[in-house]
């Protein structure tokens, strides 16, 4: 949990090796990119003429060409790489879940919606969720609970679970577990 002083270092410098380790970049291999990882990153298969003219126009206005927006500088204009290879999107599900298909340690619940994280004694122990029919379920973890619900739903789940700004949680009748 960001802001939690548990000794974890979530700085750019600390997490970069993990990003490099997950990446399989077909063009860039340097201090910012990796190869051989699960996430396939490549240049667009085709760059249309309109996009080329746009980049040239912005360069004519004085912006530098940037061949790597995930490199040392994010300033400039250029063509972004994509998380795909040979026209197939390299999603987190494709990269990390597909290899675990059939693994008894993993259970996927499709067409289910997480409602809150179950907290016991200040520790996440599971998830409360509803299936497609609206039936309420709880799943408990044997180890850790990893929340990867995206940029919008992750904070929503945390707040519905009592993790967030205490005043805001109380306004909505949610018991405060952690004031962030």
Predicted segments with their positions:
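Conserved redox-cofactor binding core of oxidoreductases
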Residues: 2-124, 128-130
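Glycine-rich loop(s) and the adjacent beta-strand/alpha-helix scaffold that form part
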Residues: 117, 126-180
